[in-house]
Amino acid sequence: INKAEQRFKVEKANISSEGESIFIKADSRLVRINLKDICYIEALGNYMKIYTQEGRFTILSTMKEIAEKLSGNDFVRVHRSYLVRLDKIESIEDHYIKMGAKHISIGKAYKEELTSRLNLL
């Protein structure tokens, strides 16, 4: 995973959405990432880490910019630092989401939005 992160260090956010995929500027080229491959996105200051099934990509962007680009694409903001893909959620317990070995906290301000986006029986 570290090799993938080093290879895809991003100089600038430059995200463009095209239906089922997004392009991010990695080094001096644009890299296509399929939206269905994104598990979650984590904010780290002015940088965002996009976690996919193949690895992770670091970009210079804000959570607000990414959330706007991915709105309506099966992603929901669950914390001020996390945006998750709904179909990658394995379970929700108390105040966190389980996605494989990763546990992501659910912020109080985002819990209602998450609940409304789930297909509850």
Give residue ranges: language-model regions.
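C-terminal output/interaction extensions
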Residues: 113-121
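C-terminal structural segments of small proteins and small subunits
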Residues: 98, 105-108, 112
